[in-house]
Design a protein with these regions (language model features):
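Short, low-complexity disordered leader/linker segments with a strong preference
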Residues: 1-9, 310
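Short, glycine-/small- and polar/acidic-enriched structural segments
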Residues: 6-142, 146-159
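A bilobed periplasmic-binding-protein/Venus flytrap-type ligand-binding module shared by bacterial periplasmic
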Residues: 27, 94-104, 191-208
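Sec/Tat-exported extracytoplasmic proteins
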Residues: 29, 37-38, 60, 65-68, ...
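Short beta-strand->loop
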Residues: 81-89, 138-140, 175-191
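Short, surface-exposed acidic
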Residues: 136-139, 175-180, 241-257, 291-300
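Secondary-structure end/capping motifs
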Residues: 205-288
């Protein structure tokens, strides 16, 4: 595209503060992939007062990233007309951890225990898994710390493999001192996470811009795979600018785990795409957790998922 050509502004809201989880977007912006596609992309991270969902709903953002479960739930129970335009993560990174000395060696032994869980969402899948296992647990809400678990205030903690698990290890706990229960190991609970979403009217009105954004983003992630230290430099720069404490080793761990999640592995799906079976799996969990008699919207796969990846 010529240097003087008009570029279309597109505002993107990741679902969390700056970290390696979003390295592909930073790289696509810094390398000029968005600009080459004719886009002027603005990355708007959420704040304590405005979530990425709020930024999207109020028109301050055109596209957001979100977990599949969260987006599908918002569409079904809150009637927010979200469209999945790309599925980046292909697996779940959620897990429970316990201390080996707790003698909680199997997931059924969580019955009657206290489990720390984030107060800012992410609770639907852990609760559904406990229900599936007929476990009665007390979920203890926390914000953004591993201290309660480290100090023995709870028996277990819900963590992301790419994030809090490594924080626990970095705090001085050896891997051998932990028992781990990966949701991806349990039938029906390996539900993909990060995807890209827009509202229905944005999809109707800006399809070409959305396609360009998705493909430039995937190009950014492909570049990250071959240039990890450069990508980490951008991540740390973003975190420093946002005055967020950071640890390069931890961000490197997160980056590598995110790249793992973007890789389909033995799944019959191309990068950037969503399997209908994964959609159905997420839908099954949401419907099983719906309160008795609750009215929920019905949705078909092809109405929710309209991909722009190659």
């Amino acid at each position: 595209m010529g240097a003087n050509a008009q570029k279309e502004t597109l505002k993107f809201a990741p679902q969390w503060f700056p970290q390696a989880q979003f390295a592909g977007y930073y790289v696509a912006l810094d390398q000029g992939f968005y600009e080459e596609a004719g886009l002027d992309v603005k990355i708007l991270h959420p704040t304590d007062d405005e979530s990425s969902m709020k930024l999207l709903r109020t028109g301050k953002a055109d596209v957001m990233s979100s977990f599949l479960m969260d987006a599908l739930s918002a569409r079904l129970s809150m009637d927010i007309p979200l469209i999945n335009i790309a599925q980046l993560s292909q697996h779940s990174s959620l897990m429970f951890v316990t201390k080996a000395k707790s003698d909680i060696d199997t997931i059924t032994e969580l019955d009657g225990k206290q489990v720390a869980i984030w107060s800012a969402g992410f609770d639907r899948l852990p609760k559904a898994l406990m229900k599936e296992k007929n476990n009665e647990v007390e979920f203890v809400p926390i914000y953004n710390t591993i201290n309660l678990f480290l100090e023995g205030g709870v028996d277990a903690m819900t963590v992301m493999y790419y994030n809090e698990y490594d924080q626990i290890i970095n705090s001085g706990v050896n891997k051998e001192e932990l028992n781990t229960f990966f949701f991806s190991d349990y039938d029906g609970f390996d539900i993909p996470e990060d995807g890209l979403y827009c509202l229905e009217h944005t999809y109707r009105e800006r399809r070409e811009d959305l396609k360009k954004f998705v493909r430039a983003t995937l190009k950014g992630w492909n570049y990250v795979e071959q240039n990890k230290e450069y990508a980490l430099n951008l991540v740390v720069e973003r975190m420093d600018k946002a005055h967020i404490a950071n640890n390069r080793a931890h961000q490197r761990w997160m980056l590598n785990r995110m790249l793992d999640l973007l890789t389909p592995g033995d799944k019959d799906v191309k990068r950037g795409h969503l399997l209908e079976s994964d959609f159905q799996r997420a839908l099954n969990v949401i419907q099983s957790e719906a309160r008795s008699g609750a009215e929920m919207q019905k949705i078909k796969f092809n109405d929710f998922y309209k991909p722009f990846a190659d």
